[in-house]
Amino acid sequence: ELDFNLGDRETIVSSRIVFYKNPIVTNAVEELFLNGESLELISINVDGLDASYELKEDGLFLLNPPDDFVLEVQVRIHPESKTDLNGLYQSSGNFCTQCEAMGFRQITYYLDRPDVLSVFTTKINANREHYPVLLSNGNLIEETNNQAIWHDPAPKPCYLFALVAGKLDFLQDEYITSTGRKVDLRVYVEP
């Protein structure tokens, strides 16, 4: 789960990741490396308790993690000042992501590798006056005045994660699948 609080001067990203140890691995894991760059760590918890970790320039080592656990991380990032156009950045007043090949590590601490597949639920919080359209991967689950929640049920590597927030127009059509299911299609563009 990812929760973005988009702001003009900073963005707070909260992540909640459920880890399960591979049953074919029999030895205890002493440390787990999570990629992370250009992140200001606010908090990190394992199963609701302060985590033991070692911060590095390119990520952090989670020390002595349990076999199965829930990791909650909160970071501060600055998309408004990013010029490399990786991770979450701003362009023409809109928030955009570029996660391929290794940009997701500039959004939160994560196993930023193509062989790690995850299901993403993304909550985007923003001022709708400035960012009326809030998009992410998958299906729109819920939308309120200042929030949109998206769920993508298809497991995928984090380099395929996408988020866009801003003033956009769209063209819309629908498609009927061979099973008779109606699918809405939209193409978003700057006005």
Spell out what each predicted region is:
Residues 1-191:
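Acidic/His-enriched low-complexity segments
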